Amino acid sequence: MGYGQEKESTTAGLAKMNAVLHRKAEIIIKSGNTFSNPQYMDKSDNSVLERFDYIVANPPFSMKNWRDGLVGKEYGRFEGYGDMPPEKNGDYAWLMHILKTLQSNGKAAVILPHGVLFRGNAEATIRETIIKKHWIKGIISLPANLFYGTGIAACILVIDKEGAANRQGIFMIDASRGYVKDGNKNRLRERDIYRIITTFNEQITTDPKYARFIPNDEIEKKNGYNLNITRYIDSTDPEDIQDIYAHIHGGIPAVDIDGLSKYWEVFPSLKSELLSTISEKYYSLNVEHESIRQTIYKNTEFSEYGEKLDEAFAAWKAKEYPVLSTLDEDVSARELIVSLVEDIIAEFEHLTLIDKYDAYQVLLAYWNEVMNDDVSLIISESDGYTNARATDNIEEEITQGKNKGEMKVTGWEGRLIPKSIVIDAFFREEKNAIEEAENIVAETESQLVDLIESADEESALADVAENGKVKAKDIEAQIVELTSTIETEETIELEVIRTDLKLVNTKRRLEAYLVGHPLCKSTVNENGKITKSSIDYRLHIIRTEECVPESLQDDVNQLKAALDLCSKVSDYNKVVKDLNKALDEKCRARYEVLTDDEILDLLVNKKWFDSIFSGINDLYTAISHCLTSRIIELAERYENTLPELDKETIEYEAKVKSHLERMGFKWE
């Protein structure tokens, strides 16, 4: 059973919801001011606060009115510390309340502003008393701007009264740099949380820039009970020092190259491929800047490292496949992910250049985004893996028109297996045909853009182009407008007959008319008749192809070329649409007949494992990116020596003086 107290009803509701989400539904949240009206009193003595085994709290930071209504209701919470918390700051008041309501062997975790670690006056006195009691087991410094409503940096005080008498110090973690930007706030990643937990639980001190066990003497005698994390852990990066000699004479300082030792230890031959020794303290670059990444990828040891990464992932896959291919209702999703995480960390722990916590982040990010839902669906329903044969329509709400508010089907997707995976597995030929047609569309559109961009501003094509685009109907209208006034003997006769088709509406009339007007023979269609459409077609041919005057030739040709490209785009877009529709139907039908083996292969191997490996492979790619970026940075920093820059400056100065003199000015 869990217990809590909250003054604000809204926040109390959130606390209850949070408990349910964490599968702790049995919780009681009472209302009231924790300081002036504590709700949990000892059952045998109503004048004594009830004590608890575990307390977790994230109280309001720096509360200014915490003493309101407190007189006579202190319940001994603030006695024995040498002073009272400041009237305008309730941070230590919360901590003292928690310490009072904690059992003699109880444990607590409290989130408080960083200031509680080092502020002076009354708070310093209280802090010293708490430190001397050895109740603080650990301090975890968190990133700033982590919580909504405040950008203040916070920390977690881990309290453990059990074993306090024999406690030799405080375990400190500086996790202030482990986060990712999320909008205008910072957010702890899964890897950051996991690193904090494992480092604290296992008391890991292999990275002194992240965590240390601080002896009592260092806290009490050396730092006067000041717990500011920066006094004990220096998490800052080493200063990137500029080398004056290298700026003057050139060369990359050996001290900077040695700073990349973690890479050279794994890829020893790569160092000699990229760099040559100038002297004991300086190197030169052997390859051009743009060839560095290619040189790294071609390096045998770099490739071998990639193979080791593949082997580590393959070993993890081999271990997890039997588990992930036999999920049922007896499996706990929570226990499953813990096992998956522990195993992937074990496999990647020996790969020195890839942080095991990065591998953890890849897995946890995919679990939270996709895999958790998949596993939950499989283990929570009797259908299990056969859910993979199901497909679901994608619906969107109609936002306007007479059907506004109704839902319409806009597509479909596999319930467990994305259709992209099914297409890749069974319909590669059809997919290639679609991609080929799409490539033609893209290439044709590119040609059309080039044609528009190359057109003269005064051209007819430029007149119909808008924001670099044209429409076929606008091009056709422009062609008609340009050529409609073109006249020949034939067009004159055709225009006459077009206005009075009765002249040729019978076979006898047609034959008689053609004897006197032989130029009109070109409009007789395949049925032996002259119609309005056959006349219009002939007029179009005459005016746009046969009799275009030289003054209009360039414009008409350009418009016709653009129209041809537009038509090609339209035709192939239709091809793409038809092919997609046919593939969509075949793909959906294929879901229904997936075999059990196909389901496991598509779901476990192609969806889960391939997605996770994609993230792992990004870590491998990042190695070359980081190494390349650093070497280029160093090479460019010392590429131009001071004498060279000085010489270049003198040359430019001479050129400027020469130009000024030619303009009639003198520069002394």
Identify the residue ranges that each predicted region occupies.
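Conserved SAM-binding loop of SAM-dependent methyltransferases across substrates and taxa
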Residues: M1
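S-adenosyl-L-methionine
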Residues: Q5-L49
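A conserved structural/catalytic subdomain of Rossmann-like adenosyl-cofactor enzymes
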Residues: L49-R415, K419, E429, I434, ...
